Amino acid sequence: MKVDLPESRLPSLYRDFRPLKDLNPDGYEANISTWRDFFLQQYISNSNRIIFTIGTRTLQELTHEVYGVPKSIDIAIDVLVNEGNLIPMELFNLGGMYTDNSRKGFWKWVRSWKESTNMYKSRKDETNFYLREDKFIIKANLEKEYQRFHELLKRSVFMEASSITDLVFTRNEFVTTESLQSFFSTYDEETKNVFLHFIENYKHIIVSKDNVIKVIAAEVEDITSRFSKGITENDLRIASVKVGIININKQITRLRKEINESNIKLRGPEFNELPKRIRIEYKQARLLSEKHLSRLLKFQNNLAQVRTQIDTSATNAVLIQTLSESNEVIKSINGYIGSTEKVEDLLDEIKEGHDRTEEVNDLLAHYNKGQDEEAEEEIERELEQLELDEKNNNKEENKNQDLHEPKESSSEDLLKRLNNLKINTNEGPVQDNENHDNEIRKIMMEEQPR
């Protein structure tokens, strides 16, 4: 295969660079980092694969036409393992995928399944093909695929399940069911087993036994809470009934296809050219297929009825349990309430307390009424006094106004009298002028303030 590595560094990357750890630590770390990034890009991050396999085939794939087999890629693989990017398959199966690598107990546990004195080592010897034949779980990819799987499961099983029969499957039915088939179809058998192990032992979505799977996720707890979390004999029987229905459906589909093809042939122009004996055989074969189809349809209906009865029984069991629990709640509440005599006494006490409260209210109302009357009388007296004061003020104002009015009227009279006076432009007797002047002086004297 074509190796995408820096051309200028190929000699250093392909040789045994382990001695550089002491001689040239920077070069040693650079080589490890380059191979690590190469594996991440080429095998791990750039795909949806869940299992990563190492061994002789890996070395052969990376063999360079000039530099040969890479002599030290085991170090980069060990780094990926120790970082937690790759999980050894045996450790995964033992349940150690999420164990903290930094804890002392982790590698003590690892040593229990690997004869290692320190950390995981992918090198087995010093030969040309020095890598162990090992398999790893690509942790990030497995978790990413789980998110995709969970969304599919949520939109199908979680939302559509209404009875325990909707949560019990054979293994084959589970991985081939319509909503999940697109997910599992991209995996080989080994990868399917790994994923099923993951969702059972790490995510606790399912339980399995004897090729039967039961969904027990928290999202369907309203159904599973009434039944055992493990696989029971009833679960095995339910799975058997569902397998029977699936197999009959497959046979019905096949027979319908055969009958349709036979009908097309019987109606074709070439059919009439066949010998009579052969035409009879064709028609008999079609009749046999139709009879067999009729029997299968009856079997299908019978099994469907059995499944319906199972669902009904399961619902009845849930209903009975619910009624039983409801009865216990009612009994408990009634026990807390006590006897009917106790309730009657309580009601009598409440009535007596109510009557006493009414009496107190009446007394308080009468007392408040007396106080209100006194307050109203006081207000009335104050209002009368205010009205009296207002009348006196009005009289005083009118009196003052009268004092000013004569002066005003006298002024008006003066103006009128002056207007009535006529000045004679003709020369007349002096006596008349004197009389006129005297009249003016008289008027002015009258207007002098008294």
From Swiss-Prot:
One of its GO terms (molecular function) is phosphatidic acid binding. One of its GO terms (cellular component) is multivesicular body. Residues 387-416 have a biased composition (Basic and acidic residues). Residues 387-439 are annotated as: Disordered. InterPro entries: Snf7_fam (IPR005024). GO terms for biological process: late endosome to vacuole transport via multivesicular body sorting pathway; nuclear pore complex assembly; vesicle budding from membrane. It holds the Pfam family Snf7. Present with 2530 molecules/cell in log phase SD medium. This is Uncharacterized protein YJL049W. It comes from Saccharomyces cerevisiae (strain ATCC 204508 / S288c).
